[in-house]
């Protein structure tokens, strides 16, 4: 359900700056590869995956759909994914996949959760 919050260019830029202020020391500008499994029409994916990593000169690997979760295996197999953002459902599904849990991607530096507290 939409919360009716007005998004302005200034709001978006402030959000990008907030994200960078928290993670700047962990982002290797121009070298990161972020997996975008959430749709960009959600503000979290739009600001974090697209705007933040675009600003950092990084690559976005777009997953057309994370369902079934095996769709993401190809992205992890073919790209050196360094960051992934998601929601509880996505992370729970990944951790229940044998290919992910048995051999986690060596290049993955960080996972960031949005939408609710990570469980």
What do these predicted regions represent?
Residues 7-11, 68, 86:
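Short acidic-hydrophobic sequence patches enriched in Asp/Glu that either
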Residues 1, 57, 115:
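Conserved G/P- and acidic residue-centered "switch" motifs that form tight phosphate/ATP-binding loops
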Residues 38, 65, 81-119:
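Adenylate-forming
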Residues 13-33, 43-82, 93, 97:
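Conserved AMP-binding/adenylation subdomain of ANL enzymes
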Residues 1-17:
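Conserved AMP-binding A3 loop
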Residues 1, 12, 34, 40, ...:
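Conserved S/T- and glycine-rich ATP-binding loop of Class I adenylate-forming
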Residues 7, 48, 60, 116-118:
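Short, flexible micro-motifs
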Residues 3, 29-33, 106-108:
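Short acidic capping loops at alpha-helix termini that bridge into adjacent secondary structure
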